[in-house]
Amino acid sequence: MPSPSRIGIIHGALGAFAVALVVKSGQVQLWQGAAWAARAERQHFAAATVLAPRGRIVDASGTTLVESRELVRLSVAPPELKSPKTLAAALVRAGVPRAVAARASDPKRKWVAVPGRFLPADVAKIVPMRGVYAEPAAERVGVVSPSVRRLVGRLDAAGRPVDGLELALDSALRGEQGTATVVRDARGRRFESPTAPGTAARPGHTVALTINYALQDICDRALADAVSRMGADGGDIVVLDPHSGQVLALASRRPDPRTSAATAISEPYEPGSTLKPFIAAKLLELGRAREDEVVNTHNGEWVLDGRRITDSHKAPRMTLREVIMQSSNIGIVQFAARLSPREEFEALRDVGVGMPTGVPYPAEAAGTLREPARWSRTSPASIAMGYEVTVTPLQLAVAYAAIANGGELVEPALVKEIRDADGAPVFRHARRVVRRVI
């Protein structure tokens, strides 16, 4: 039996320990309480970004051209796994290659990012597992028309716009991200807190294009048939309302299927004889020629300054009207000689040659029309025949629309309307006349 002195010593030691414990507890609560509480909150709570659903792109009638589909990215911390074999089997069932599943469940590895993105339903049993970390992602899905895909554009693996209307209209489509507080339980699983403060994500706007998908499909098939029959490398079709400026269809076809841009907007070419009507319009406007005025067309062959000019439709003489109808090179060169280089330049610049049209497309090409000071001695004749100049198919369509609508150059439009998540319009296309040209 311990002596009274030893018992006293033990009691004293226990009392001193109790006092020290009370003092330390008070110190922790009074002086360090806030710091420890913050540390505990950090361990159990975390801030998370809530992705905003990207807005849809639809055609003029409301048919969906592209929309977002919610997906999930997975990462694994193998040392945290409770049952590596269970995870490996679940990953294989979700379509993950066995080699990747084995890597993700190897406890010797610290962290494994599982390649690819998954439908939430396919990984619903995987996401709650301890050691599995899920991150929301999205995928753009829509119609299969290559022309529409080129016009709409692409997103990269991180969901950022790369080109096309996805890039041009990103501020309207991307929405606003929200925030949420995530709670970790004892097993490391994460759940969104139902009580902690957060902000709701605001979905992106819906963008309605001027494109009519049914008409677009007709143009795609017609273009494919024409390219095949003609043995051509490619082609473009632009269908434009000459009065409103709305682009109703925009089909492009190139031999390389990887071509990512809408070439009717992005690839200029020499227009050739299609520019002759604008030279004729300038002549008529300035009173330098009459429709029935006749010039010598030399039976289809003529030499000017040592340069041989020919016509496919051979005739000794033609009126200005016939020159345009038969696309006579000889006739238009002789008539165009009545214009100064500056006047000939203005005839084309006025209808938009060499200038961007104003459509919201990042890769739009302006084409080329050099200032008269940079012309050579043969340039006036070449340009009258549509050479030494480049235009895009859209530019040429806009120029011809000015003839069709009575003389006004109307800015083309690809976007008909933009609506917010509630369906309220935030933008509507309105006809814009750039200038009167004829």
How would you label these PLM feature ranges?
Residues 191-235:
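Conserved, well-ordered alpha-helix/loop/beta-strand core segments that scaffold catalytic motifs
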Residues 185-196, 235-273, 278-438:
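Beta-lactam-recognizing serine transpeptidase/beta-lactamase-like catalytic domain environment
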Residues 35-51, 215-229:
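Short, basic/aromatic recognition patches
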Residues 30-31, 75-76, 80, 85-98, ...:
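Small/polar-residue-rich segments within soluble enzyme cores
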